[in-house]
Amino acid sequence: MKTYNKLPRPLPDFAIALTGFAIAALGFWTAAWPSLREDVSANANSLASAFGLGPVDADFVLALLLSAGSIALAAAIALSAYRGFHNGAWAGPKPSPDRSYGNARIISSPLALQRRFKVWKRGEKSQPGLVVGGVGASRNHLLVAPIQNALIVGGTGSGKTTSVLAPSQIALIESETPVSTFTLDPKGELYNLTARHAMESGAKVVMIDFSDSKTSDGWLPLQPAIDCAKGVNGRRPDEMPAEIRILASTLIPDRHESSPIWTNAARILFSGLSAFVASSERIPDECRNLSTVAALASMPQETLQKITEELPIGSSSRQQLSAVAFAPAETFGGFATNLNAALDPYADPSVSPMLSRSDYRPEDFAKGRVCLYVKFNGGSTALDALVSAFVSQTLETLRRVAERECGGRLPRPVYCLFEEFAQLPKIDGMQKHVSIVRGAGVRMVFVAQDRSQIESVYRSEAPAIFNNLDTTLFLSSNDLKTCKHYSEALGSYTVETVQNSRTRGANTGSSTQSRTLHEARLFRPEDLAKWDWQAGHLIIDRGNVYACSSLPLSKTFAGDLIGLGGEEADAAKLAQMRPERPVKNLLPAPVWEWQGNDKATFGEIAAAISGVGDPRFM
């Protein structure tokens, strides 16, 4: 199988072949030529005389012929090797010029790659985009695709981080055009590798760490709702319901029951309590957090009944909550248990400190360069919904800021590198985000082990997401469905088969030659299943297929920029590169305590529930 990590080199190959032919010619000159010289010279002069020419210097003619022959043969061999390697196929037979059954080709020659993609060279600033690979074994050149939205398909061990994401993060930091980044970084590797470099470049670096909250920057999920309630930072009170519904639809999971009444009631109650906490003058500012919402949500059944009775008669919220508030005690107990189980992780003292204040706001992207990293525990799903809510809230705010404050487009493009995107809970409206925010200057790169992961999470919305992707980087896949999809998408080419046959008679014989054309897939599913980092990277871009090298970060000049010096970044090296972060989240989030016997508060919570409305329709 071919590997695009090491390409044929026409000039060196030509030089090697020429050296071999020169040695052979010299051997002929010294060993065989002396004995042949007189006869050849006599015949040559005789032939020259017949044409009216003068005497011939046989030594000169032979030297000229040997030189020209050696050069021609060496050039033919080098060119044949180069064309054979870049013939447009990988594992299949040589393509035919005929197009009867298709003309799909892999574009892999260095010149063609450098015409299509931006080339980031050592010592120069990069162009913003996704680093899709390199040019052969050269550590001094990287290819950058100026993408809108992209998908990276790569299974475990495919080199997603070391050959694509880390070089891309560095390229964006080094971009000639200032850009910002929003990176989902499950294991924290990208932060360890690139954060110090980002700081030194002058970018604001933010780390939201859901796996170790003690050193995390703060993120207050209710901050947008609080801003709406207060009418600050360009927000209006009438926008608060939409902000709260982002949290409700993500943090309160759909239980997939035969009747959605329990999920609806939980989301309505959560939304109303969140609106109350965000807006009520009874709540001190330091207590406007999810811990207070969780504490209120654990109210006894009698308290919920009193709040429900304050809701307008006939309203959807009253109907939904009445089914829970006035249910038998055992039924209400199950509802309360499920609601508390959904909210307790966010009120846990190990997490609540980082959720009680905001050190970062999405609006910061409009003010200057930001490198935002989000780390979460890939081995635990306890806080995955919170990560999804963070992503949804950030994207929605970026869109709003672009529309209202920046004339429709952010002053600096924001590149979102979403690693392990498909392992997070579904982000409501993602198919809309993908299509809408690109106009605001937001570029998204989704990273998944295969297409089936995204389809299983987003189901009917998955095609809309895929249709808004203009570039796919295929690293590897063990998923048969994914391999079949790309096998069909990459098309076919025409193969020519020549058959010779000979017949013999008593006194004569004859031979015939037949030429047959047939179809061959550019990649069969089994070919794609064998493709991995040792072969290179496949880039599917606007109907064309490109193949380039997949060198790890340490083998490129991008690794030199962050101090790898040609060495792999093992655990010790990553720990050394990671910026020091102070411990700043030790005290649990402050919680407002309510005794539950204040009629005025019942009415205020009921008004908040009515004001937020029914989140099912959002």
What are these regions (language model features)?
Residues I23, R105, S126, V132, ...:
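Polar low-complexity intrinsically disordered regions enriched in Ser/Thr and small residues
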Residues R122-A137, I313-E330, V495-Q499:
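N-terminal short leaders/motifs
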Residues F117-G123, G231-R235, I252-S259, I283, ...:
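Low-complexity, polar-biased intrinsically disordered regions enriched in Pro/Ser/Thr/Gly
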